[in-house]
Amino acid sequence: MKQSILSFIQKHQLLKEGAKIIVGVSGGSDSMALLHFLKNLQEQWEIEVIALTINHQLRGEDSTADQKFVEQWCFHSDIRCIAHQVDVGEYQRQYRVSEELAARRLRYEIYEAEMRKQGADYLALGHHGDDQVETLFMRLTRVATSNAFEGIPVKRSFASGQLIRPFLCVNKQLILNYVKENEVPFREDQTNKDNKYTRNYYRNEIIPLLTKNNERLFITAQRLSETLREDENYLAKEANRMVEEVIIWDENFSKISFSNQAFIERPHALQRRAYHLILNYLYDTLPKDLSYIHEEKFFALIERQEGNTYIDFPLSLRVENSYGKIQLYFPNRHPRHSVFHLPLQVPDQVELPDGARITSEWIDATLDKNSRNNIIIPIDSVALPLHIRTRKPGDRMTWDGLKGTKKLKDIWIDAKIPTNERDTWPIVTDDNNTIIWLVGLKKAFGSNQFCQSGEKIKLSYHKGNI
């Protein structure tokens, strides 16, 4: 098992020497095995391993006992342990979601907060190959899109680094063999036997039937997941390119239009992905009652060449076909008169529509990087002049420590910014339209750029009176 996991880590570049790793630990066999495995790599790889356990307080004394068990084992194993308690029941009542979803959201909020607080490179979770099989078959019964089989990703960008799952290459039985051979203690969660939870039903009833004649199904599932994820990444890029070439926005970014011929002449695989991209642009959050039926109606509508007809989607989104010209818009939504795009010289002072101001000046000194309303920009890292604008469809940015990019929409959601505030939120870009500063939330430049020599620009945000 050890060599299989090490080969898997190397293949997917899951770890680097000298990294700081937070391990999500529940006290069960999977997470305890992962913590033990990474602890044994600590000296060889010069990594720092931190255990993070979260008490969901769903099982009374058992939940408390799980937390104490993890803390005590970490103490005796010389592993730093961080413990949190969350109130899942209160979250359920406040947001009216299921127990499973409430627990997951709270868990990942803490994961993200601790990743940033500790400056960790990785969050390691103990999902294994059988979890992958469960996920694939659960999605098959609920999702009618090709990415249903992407399954659980081996790694993805998360908080200050990456979320990794080194155990996706092994199954539950191999993990149980590992903890037995290495005398790693663990606790049994009795709720795992309760089939009222969807995943437990698949785990206890469906998966045993599938693996009865093929114990290595988890390997096939993982290969399928990886292959389809590679294919989907390529198709997603092509769909983005298609949208850029075909779609036309009005000046207020409140209406989309395109020629049906320009759209339907593309491969069907790209058409479907472009359709979903368009909906993601128009909706801040996709409605729960949006289904494959709407997709079928959309494609039936856009193929018409004559006459005027329309269909209504959830939340009053209208899709209209007028003699081959397709338009998507919200009839009852007022145009965004607050859209702006303003040049920013240096030095300068620009007043925004809400009365706030952004000032710019040349400096040689550095700035406290924790100031939310200021940013230091090394001039050799940007294309001048700078611009201040509101959001555009598909806006993404990156920052120090983030692998890849992140949608501005997701940043606002993470920060719990109300939808009505996002349309007027000031964004600073350079002349190449690279986002430098999502004012008050994210900066593209980290502390390493602050320390660079050379001339810099200091931007400051001052709130208005209206």
UniProtKB/Swiss-Prot annotation:
GO terms for cellular component: cytoplasm. It is an enzyme of class 6 (ligase). Its main location: cytoplasm. ATP binds at S26, G27, G28, S29, D30, S31. Keywords: ATP-binding, Cytoplasm, Ligase, Nucleotide-binding, tRNA processing. Ligates lysine onto the cytidine present at position 34 of the AUA codon-specific tRNA(Ile) that contains the anticodon CAU, in an ATP-dependent manner. Cytidine is converted to lysidine, thus changing the amino acid specificity of the tRNA from methionine to isoleucine. It comes from the Bacteria. GO terms for molecular function: ATP binding; tRNA(Ile)-lysidine synthase activity. One of its GO terms (biological process) is tRNA modification. It holds the Pfam family ATP_bind_3. It is found in: Cytoplasm. This is tRNA(Ile)-lysidine synthase. SMART domains: TilS_C. The N-terminal region contains the highly conserved SGGXDS motif, predicted to be a P-loop motif involved in ATP binding. It comes from Oceanobacillus iheyensis (strain DSM 14371 / CIP 107618 / JCM 11309 / KCTC 3954 / HTE831). It catalyses: cytidine(34) in tRNA(Ile2) + L-lysine + ATP = lysidine(34) in tRNA(Ile2) + AMP + diphosphate + H(+). Its EC number is 6.3.4.19. Belongs to the tRNA(Ile)-lysidine synthase family.
